[in-house]
Amino acid sequence: MAPKKKVTGLIKLQIQAGAANPAPPIGPALGQHGVNIMEFCKAYNAATEAQRGNVIPVEITVYEDRSFTFITKTPPAAELIKKAAGVAKGSATPHTVKVAKLTQAQVNEIASTKMEDLNATSLEGAAKIIAGTARSMGITVEG
């Protein structure tokens, strides 16, 4: 087995799927670690092409020889909730002004999508996490 490469940095970004370009915020974040920005952009765009339209969080591990690896996560729960509810943004005052409603089935669908990134052991637990996020955005969960 090849010797382990020394990690010099871990960068976490949220980028539109298939739309990474060297402009800020990507360029400066990668540039200060000496990563080839265009190489990352091409690899990220190829990996996320199927999910166009979503914001995809990515964790980039930078090694001392300036090479990198990256792991894409599932879209943020808030983004999935807004898309399912059909709203542009959550409520400014979530506990007094409600902006939309979600059914329990929609919450379960989002929970199953997010399951691998959530700190939950069961789908019910994941659904409770998603429902809590929705409530804090001023979106009512029915059922």
From Swiss-Prot:
GO biological process: translation
Ribosomal protein as UniProt keyword: yes
Entry comment on modification after translation: One or more lysine residues are methylated.
Gene Ontology molecular function, alphabetical: large ribosomal subunit rRNA binding; structural constituent of ribosome
InterPro entries referenced in this protein's UniProt entry, alphabetically: Ribosomal_uL11 (IPR000911), Ribosomal_uL11_bac-typ (IPR006519), Ribosomal_uL11_C (IPR020783), Ribosomal_uL11_C_sf (IPR036769), Ribosomal_uL11_CS (IPR020785), Ribosomal_uL11_N (IPR020784), Ribosomal_uL11_N_sf (IPR036796)
Keyword Transcription: no
Record keywords, A-Z: Methylation, Ribonucleoprotein, Ribosomal protein, RNA-binding, rRNA-binding
Pfam families: Ribosomal_L11, Ribosomal_L11_N
Signal peptide stretch: none
GO cellular component, one term: cytosolic large ribosomal subunit
Cysteine-cysteine disulfides: none
NCBIfam families noted in UniProt: L11_bact (TIGR01632)
HAMAP family cross-referenced by the UniProt entry: Ribosomal_uL11
Summary of the function given for this chain in its UniProt record: Forms part of the ribosomal stalk which helps the ribosome interact with GTP-bound translation factors.
Quaternary state and interactors: Part of the ribosomal stalk of the 50S ribosomal subunit. Interacts with L10 and the large rRNA to form the base of the stalk. L10 forms an elongated spine to which L12 dimers bind in a sequential fashion forming a multimeric L10(L12)X complex.
Family: Belongs to the universal ribosomal protein uL11 family.
Name of the protein in its database record: Large ribosomal subunit protein uL11
Species annotation: Arthrobacter sp. (strain FB24)
Lineage: Bacteria, Bacillati, Actinomycetota, Actinomycetes, Micrococcales
Gene it is expressed from: rplK
